[in-house]
Swiss-Prot record:
Organism: Mus musculus
GO molecular function: co-receptor binding; transferrin receptor activity
Name used for this protein in its record: Transferrin receptor protein 2
Tissue distribution of the protein: Predominantly expressed in liver. Also expressed in kidney, spleen, brain, lung, heart and muscle with very low expression in kidney, muscle and heart.
CDD domains cross-referenced by the UniProt entry: M28_TfR, PA_TfR
Motif (Endocytosis signal): 23-26
């Protein structure tokens, strides 16, 4: 009893102190000594904290300054319920706080990441928690700015035409660098593709000819190495016509002005659309050939910045597609048998790049009406008339060569979901120095490999595998990337989570653009808020945009272009993708796809800010990889596609009256969109109410989320006939864009004009429209059904 009194007195004396609990077993002489200490400490306490003196039932405690008799037994009985209640409250509060903290740790990396040393059994050891701020600091600590600039400079000095002997040397050098990093796998993948090159024995030529076809004057093509890969070969003769950018609307305007396009040679400017699109549109309007030149008005006029030389032509392929056009839909592996077909995107008319100097000579010969003011460029000696001009003959002698190209792969395996890949890639080859075209991307890619390897060595444990790829054949239309996708499509659509492209990432230091799938928009917004602007001190990239534009995404977000490797991942393989780019505020980077795309010109163009801009891109890509590779729940906004569908439905509503007159309706499309939105909302609620530490459940949700993009690939067309099956981004009769183009034929004036290749020369065909509408609707409905999960959760009232 004496021991219990002493302990109770000790609790009473310590009650005003901070809440620190230490348990120590005392008995015998130690307890007597402890009581003596207690009496001494109690004497020093102020009156209001005077402890009870407990000596037995016949004694009462007293305290100087006040007299409150407290019988010891009554005090014990009164204190016991309070002690029990306080204990329960503390236990309950601790349990709730621990539960909330644990759930939070399982969410996005904005909270925390649990990292376990790979050499220790996780069940036998404690866990080391790395928070998002820790991961950011670790990433920035290992990311090296100086190394990237050196790599850009050195890479741009090396010849790296796809399939060349010097490219093989570069491949080996990169493999040697990767072998020095802590990586799980490093390998190469070789494809044998058909690439087109100039014939050194028979150069391409351009001549003025008379009515009989006799040559009057030869126009020298200053650099015989500049050409358009995949151009049709042979002769093309016709009257010259100036056609602005060569868009469909430009050629429509020419027809409206009475300019004859059939049988002509078109002179068009670089920009707005790709070379392949310009040639495809010209072919649809009956032109015989296309000449493409860079007009000075399309590039920066800043006298303090370098400009493109007037004698320099711009390189560009003219295959309206990606990959090897001689094996469409099939991978170009060695010894593989292919059907005797070619891509429908190959042009049937020749095309050739020319310089501004040659274009000036051609424009001076044109007669006919003066071009609209907005069509006029900055060639000082030209009046910019529309034509026609004298007869011109173009001869193209390019030839096809079977060429081996090699992609390089490096992998860090995931620790929880190694069969799910976060992929990042950059083009390695270039026609010319290619500083901005591919040296920047290659430098960032290699630095990210080194950085993440160092992070893993220092405790970072990504849940999913990181796959770093250096592509070959990019200048010929993302050949290396597309052939790899074709070869492993059956695997990749189940395993690839996201693709991040580093191509063309630094073309200036003004505007920032993200060409991306809608699934990544919310994640990009989050990352932009955490990366500093390279040219606005004290601001993040998000603040740089948001302070000057009310809608940040309208300024930053753009659709994926066909000439990007990211396009193949999304439109062909159904993998969400993104490509970042810093651009000039007023004009495009003038040296892209020319021999003047050197490190020196890029450095001058950015006024010495190249290291800062490259660092910003690396931070964007790196933080994106961290989020995608280790968040328990994939940060993909699957609800965004509901807004995309609604936006497209707005275009269809314009024709609802015309359709009603024919007994047709768009109700099925509206219903499918509603089912998709409901499925997305239901999945979101399921995730919100689920246990985040349930690994099996989280994996099930992640599988459904990562396949959303794949759901929008039409299952009703053949990948061999229509490789780009995506109903929003793809090419073909199955797309929503083709459906809208077909609807426009309802109001066509009978002139035979068309707004796209798909509808050129055709009127509205009700049976074709019904088929288009049905296939589109069922693709959208299939996406809604797949997002719903199990078959018993699907709304079958469609």
């Amino acid at each position: 009893m004496e021991q219990r009194w002493g302990l109770l007195r000790r609790v009473q004396q310590w009650s005003p102190r901070p809440s620190q609990t230490i348990y120590r077993r005392v008995e015998g002489p130690q307890l007597e000594h402890l009581e003596e200490e207690d009496r001494e400490e109690g004497a020093e306490l102020p009156a209001q904290f005077c402890p009870m003196e407990l000596k037995g039932p016949e004694h009462l405690g007293s305290c100087p300054g006040r007299s409150i008799p407290i019988p010891w037994a009554a005090a014990g009985r009164k204190a016991a319920p309070y002690l029990v209640l306080i204990t329960l409250l503390i236990f309950t509060g601790a349990f709730l706080l621990g539960y909330v903290a644990f759930r939070g740790s399982c969410q996005a990396c904005g909270d925390s990441v649990l990292v376990v040393d790979e050499d220790v059994n996780p069940e036998d050891s404690g866990r080391t928690t790395l928070y998002w701020s820790d991961l950011q600091a670790m990433f920035l600590r290992f990311l090296g700015e100086g190394r990237m600039e050196d790599t850009i400079r050195l890479t741009s000095l090396r010849e790296r035409v796809a399939g060349s002997a010097r490219m093989a040397t570069l491949v080996q050098d990169i493999l040697d660098k990767l072998s020095r990093q802590k990586l799980d796998h490093v390998w190469t993948d070789t494809h044998y593709v058909g690439l087109q090159f100039p014939d050194p024995a028979h150069a391409n030529t351009l001549h003025w000819v008379d009515a009989d076809g006799s040559v009057q004057e030869q126009l020298p093509l200053e650099d015989p190495e500049v050409y358009c890969p995949y151009s049709a070969t042979g002769n093309a003769t016709g009257k010259l016509v100036y056609a602005h950018y060569g868009r469909s609307e430009d050629l429509q305007d020419l027809k409206a002005k009475g300019v004859e396009l059939a049988g002509s040679l078109l002179l068009v400017r670089v920009g707005i659309t790709s070379f392949a699109q310009k040639v495809a549109v010209a072919q649809d309007f009956g032109a015989q050939g296309v000449l493409i030149y860079p007009d000075p008005s399309d590039f920066s006029q800043d006298p303090h910045k370098p400009g493109l030389s007037s004698h320099q032509a711009v390189y560009g392929h003219v295959h309206l597609g990606t990959g090897d056009p001689y094996t469409p839909g099939f991978p170009s592996f060695n010894q593989t048998q292919f059907p005797p077909v070619e891509s429908s995107g190959l042009p049937s008319i020749p095309a050739q790049p020319i310089s501004a100097d040659i274009a000036d000579q051609l424009l001076r010969k044109l007669t006919g009406p003066v071009a609209p003011q907005e069509w006029k460029g900055h060639l000082s000696g030209s009046p910019y008339r529309l034509g026609p001009g004298p007869d011109l003959r173009l001869v193209v002698n390019n030839h096809r060569v079977s060429t081996p190209i090699s992609n390089i792969f490096a992998c860090i395996e995931g620790f929880a979901e190694p069969d799910h890949y976060v992929v990042i890639g950059a083009q390695r080859d270039a026609w010319g120095p290619g500083a901005a075209k591919s040296a920047v991307g290659t430098a960032i890619l290699l630095e990210l490999v080194r950085t993440f390897s160092s992070m893993v060595s220092n405790g970072f444990r990504p849940r999913r595998s990181l796959l770093f790829i250096s592509w070959d054949g990019g200048d010929f239309g993302s050949v290396g990337a597309t052939e790899w996708l074709e070869g492993y499509l059956s695997v990749l659509h189940l395993k690839a989570v996201v693709y991040v492209s580093l191509d063309n990432s630094v073309l200036g230091d003004g505007k920032f653009h993200a060409k991306t799938s809608p699934l990544l928009v919310s994640l990009i917004e989050n990352i932009l808020k955490q990366v500093d602007s390279p040219n606005h001190s004290g601001q993040t990239l998000y603040e740089q945009v948001a302070l000057t534009h009310p809608s940040w995404d309208a300024e930053v977000i753009q659709p994926l272009p066909m000439d990007s490797s990211a396009y193949s991942f999304t439109a062909f393989a159904g993998v969400p993708a993104v490509e970042f780019s810093f651009m000039e505020d007023d004009r495009v980077y003038p040296f892209l796809h020319t021999k003047e795309d050197t490190y020196e010109n890029l450095h001058k163009m950015l006024r010495g800010r190249l290291p800062a801009v490259v660092q910003a891109v690396a931070q964007l890509a790196g933080q994106l990889l961290i989020r995608l590779s280790h968040d328990h729940l994939l940060p993909l906004d699957f609800g965004r596609y509901g807004d995309v569908v609604l936006r497209h439905i707005g275009n269809l509503n314009e024709f609802s009256g015309d359709l009603k007159e024919r007994g047709l309706t768009l109700q099925w499309v509206y219903s499918a969109r509603g089912d998709y939105i409901r499925a997305a909302e239901k999945l979101r609620k399921e995730i919100y109410s689920s246990e985040r530490n349930d690994e099996r459940l989280m994996r099930m949700y992640n599988v459904r989320i990562m396949r959303v993009e794949f759901y929008f690939l039409s299952q009703y067309v053949s990948p061999a006939d229509s490789p780009f099956r995506h109903i929003f981004l793809g090419q073909g009769d199955h797309t929503l864009g083709a459906l809208v183009d077909h609807l426009r034929m309802l109001r066509a004036d009978g002139s035979g004009a068309a707004s796209s290749r798909l509808t050129a020369g055709l009127g509205f065909q009700e049976s074709r429209f019904r088929r288009q509408l049905a296939l589109l609707t069922w693709t959208l409905q299939g996406a809604a059904n797949a997002l719903s999960g199990d078959v018993w959760n699907i709304d079958n009232n469609f």
